[in-house]
Amino acid sequence: MTTETFVKDIKPGLKNLNLIFIVLETGRVTKTKDGHEVRTCKVADKTGSINISVWDDVGNLIQPGDIIRLTKGYASVFKGCLTLYTGRGGDLQKIGEFCMVYSEVPNFSEPNPEYSTQQAPNKAVQNDSNPSASQPTTGPSAASPASENQNGNGLSAPPGPGGGPHPPHTPSHPPSTRITRSQPNHTPAGPPGPSSNPVSNGKETRRSSKR
């Protein structure tokens, strides 16, 4: 003979559940994309209440106050709430009405903090991984200003060592010397004041001597 399970003993993932319960409420019908009608009903036994999801015509036949035997059901979590389903080959059979001892509390289909805490750490882990990923990004950004500082040091800091800025100036000096060298070549007349006088004097003496 099959053993009956109480509502209080239902856990997520259990299969082949056999229960006897009374229907307390029938919920609104919702249609799936496939055109099926789904109705959520609140049922209870003496240990507590739970929601059961019923499909199509069976949901239309169930009425509050019906005492039903469920065979081969299974339990799963839907939107954070424990829900009872009819499995493959399962059956819902009406065995009576009204005359059954039941308790609405505790309601095992209420959102369970254990399920939320199981989801919360996962989100926390993701949040932890995100800042860790953001930290390395800040690292290279800190390195980039360092490189900028190095570039700035290459230009401004070497004045401390002195030798750094001077080499660029030293190559600038040789061209200036070249220019000065070219200037005397082109400007023997440029400094004519001192040099032209003796030259002119020589010419004058030559002219005077020729005369």
From Swiss-Prot:
Phosphorylated by ATM in response to DNA damage. Phosphorylation prevents degradation by the proteasome, hence stabilization of the protein and accumulation within cells. GO terms for molecular function: DNA binding; DNA polymerase binding; G-rich strand telomeric DNA binding; single-stranded DNA binding. The modification Phosphothreonine is found at T117. Component of the SOSS complex, a multiprotein complex that functions downstream of the MRN complex to promote DNA repair and G2/M checkpoint. In the SOSS complex, acts as a sensor of single-stranded DNA that binds to single-stranded DNA, in particular to polypyrimidines. The SOSS complex associates with DNA lesions and influences diverse endpoints in the cellular DNA damage response including cell-cycle checkpoint activation, recombinational repair and maintenance of genomic stability. Component of the SOSS complex, composed of SOSS-B (SOSS-B1/NABP2 or SOSS-B2/NABP1), SOSS-A/INTS3 and SOSS-C/INIP. SOSS complexes containing SOSS-B1/NABP2 are more abundant than complexes containing SOSS-B2/NABP1. Directly interacts with ATM, SOSS-A/INTS3 and RAD51. Interacts with INTS7. Belongs to the SOSS-B family. SOSS-B1 subfamily. This is SOSS complex subunit B1. The lineage of its organism: Eukaryota, Metazoa, Chordata, Craniata, Vertebrata.
